[in-house]
UniProtKB/Swiss-Prot annotation:
The gene is ubiC. Belongs to the UbiC family. One of its GO terms (biological process) is ubiquinone biosynthetic process. GO terms for molecular function: chorismate lyase activity. Pathway: Cofactor biosynthesis; ubiquinone biosynthesis. Pfam families: Chor_lyase (PF04345). Substrate binds at R78, L131, E190. Keywords: Cytoplasm, Lyase, Pyruvate, Ubiquinone biosynthesis. This is Probable chorismate pyruvate-lyase. Its EC number is 4.1.3.40. It catalyses: chorismate = 4-hydroxybenzoate + pyruvate. It is found in: Cytoplasm. PANTHER family: CHORISMATE PYRUVATE-LYASE.
Length: 204
């Protein structure tokens, strides 16, 4: 796999839209995957024998233009590949504000303080653990609406797919979602790579 942290971050600036406002959503099985509200990690695991998270990079960085309008400070950016039986299926990019990381955490005055702080620290200690396991297992984290976007074949993510020996014949589709945690929000974007699209569209 010809990918290193040297090129991190891979994310590119793009406008995201509500699915109801896009007429060009793919008329295929991929559309259902884009709009599914459950954990993508759990769903991917049902389509392979071995699921793996490959970390491309993670660091405190400035978000891209218009990527996280509510944030004026650097955020924790984590980019990974979700791989099924050794094949990268999904590029995932997560943006976590410092209020969630704990560096600007308020002084909580209740019995849940220790639990909250431990949960915040988990985001920077994930390693190869899927973020979805944390997002969908905590009763304190509430998922928001799904937005979608179409990535051009000449963009950075298409170049990433090409470096993974996946031919990009058409634009890539992705989705993103805000997750709410104790008054703060983090963003998770998931872009389906060509290998995933080929498999999904061939499935019944």
């Amino acid at each position: 796999m010809n990918v290193t942290s040297i090129s991190f971050p891979y994310g590119e600036s793009i406008h995201w839209f509500s699915p109801q406002k896009i007429d060009s959503l793919p008329h295929s099985q991929l559309k259902e995957w884009l709009l599914a509200t459950g954990s993508l990690t759990q769903r991917l695991k049902t389509h392979c024998k071995h699921f793996e998270v490959k970390v491309l990079g993670e660091h405190l960085l400035e978000p891209l233009a218009d990527e996280f309008p509510a944030q004026t400070n650097p955020v924790w950016i984590r980019e990974v590949l979700l791989c099924l039986d050794g094949t990268p299926w999904v590029f995932a990019r997560t943006l976590i504000p410092q209020t969630i990381l704990g560096s600007q955490t308020p002084n909580y005055q209740n019995a849940d303080d220790k639990q909250i702080r431990e949960q915040q620290n988990d985001f920077t200690r994930l390693g190869t653990r899927p973020l979805g396991e944390l997002l969908f297992s905590s009763p304190d984290i509430t998922p928001g609406n799904i937005e979608v976007a179409q990535f051009e074949t000449c963009g950075r993510l298409a170049a990433l797919a090409t470096s993974l020996n996946q031919q990009v014949n058409s634009s890539l589709w992705g989705r993103r979602r805000y997750f709410n945690l104790h008054g703060s929000q983090l963003i998770v974007s998931e872009i389906f790579l060509p290998a995933a699209v080929e498999y999904i569209n061939q499935s019944i």
